[in-house]
């Protein structure tokens, strides 16, 4: 196997499409916002592609912006040299340069987020050069440029013994399919360079390099003789080593007699070696077919899983939209807030202010150790939905708890203690305690969180408002009135200590139980971890 890795300082290959999905939140530009704030981002480093293989050109807008109505043009060197054109929500192959027709494919699964990928197939040496992508609309135009480098590692070298010449043995090497022009080097057993007797490196019909070189090995250089072909762009080479004994050097007639005597044995050994090679080739072919069958099976399973994932994602978005019908107006209770927290005058946001300036007024509803606050509202029946803007905080807990939970001392945020909460730790670790820690993987980091309580069904669900996806649902039996729970964490380790803010929503319902509701919620599953310490 040949290692095709390249230093990031020079070239950096582009990964597959699945690794290029940008895990970021949805930021929409406001009407009239200056187009200069939008950037077109392409590959950061030059792209290295192998001859005959496929390469991907990713481009996206930052901040994210719906590009479905835009013109997106991939070009080479100049914008009029069209590689691929997307215009008026359709692709226009007739506008392509002849060299790129039937060789491109546009992947626009995330075009609504301003992210697209162009695949270029069957790479040839002439594809090398400068490329760019350009986004254009009535109020915005921008482009990004990058370089494409092309390399071919070439075929396995073929070495042959041509015979005796000028008192030595003549060796000849042939290979093809190299790009750019390779470097050939002969060396003796001591690593010293051997000058070639003949060397020719020429272009072939596919614009690749073919080479032929020979060397005459004399008695002083016999033993191990090696020849290497190096691709300087890839920093890779192919090398052959041949062993030649001194007895094969032309000389006395005794050598000729010995050679004639050993020739039948050499022929037998060659026949045996040929048989072994054929057997190995058949074995490799069998293994290749088995690998292809396994690959087909895995591909089918992957497609099935992707279909199921798409269905679940669509179902979660439908459940979120249904939950919004039960929006309620939630207000923070300042009397419950820990002394280190600051509740806004309108009761809609809470933030950490560090150590309290002095002793807080005593109140039986105030939390003494938990840096949290509850809502004024108490929910003991019906369905209720509210949303909280979490911004870029790296640590928080949100959800609901029993109104009667103890206000003094620490508490474990689990259903057994009367807490049903979702937590974020260190900016990327989302989890719940149910009752053990269950880690959650989110496709898009939420900047706004939706919480839906169905009291009679015993369900508390969380939604990522940034992409409308369902995150997690607690299933339990509630034994008393519940309050909305807010904990911004007093010692946030992030760079953006935004407050937790209750978002205004149009109140469409009163939270009255609804009959014949068969909504279902999806739950990610992970093995339970050992119990955690107090939070």
Swiss-Prot record:
SMART domains: IG, IGv, PRY, SPRY. The chain crosses the membrane at residues 257-277. Residues 35-256 are extracellular. It is a single-pass type I membrane protein. InterPro entries: B30.2/SPRY, B30.2/SPRY_sf, BTN3A2-like_Ig-C, Butyrophylin_SPRY, ConA-like_dom_sf, Ig-like_dom, Ig-like_dom_sf, Ig-like_fold. Residues 340-367 are annotated as: Disordered. Residues 54-135 form the Ig-like V-type domain. Residues 1-34 form the signal peptide. One of its GO terms (biological process) is T cell receptor signaling pathway. Keywords: Coiled coil, Disulfide bond, Glycoprotein, Immunoglobulin domain, Membrane, Signal, Transmembrane, Transmembrane helix. GO terms for cellular component: external side of plasma membrane; plasma membrane. Residues 276-315 form a coiled coil. Residues 278-535 are cytoplasmic. It comes from the Eukaryota. Glycans are attached at residues 102, 139, 224. It is found in: Membrane. Residues 310-509 form the B30.2/SPRY domain. Disulfide bonds join 59-133. GO terms for molecular function: signaling receptor binding. Belongs to the immunoglobulin superfamily. BTN/MOG family. This is Butyrophilin-like protein 9. The gene is BTNL9.
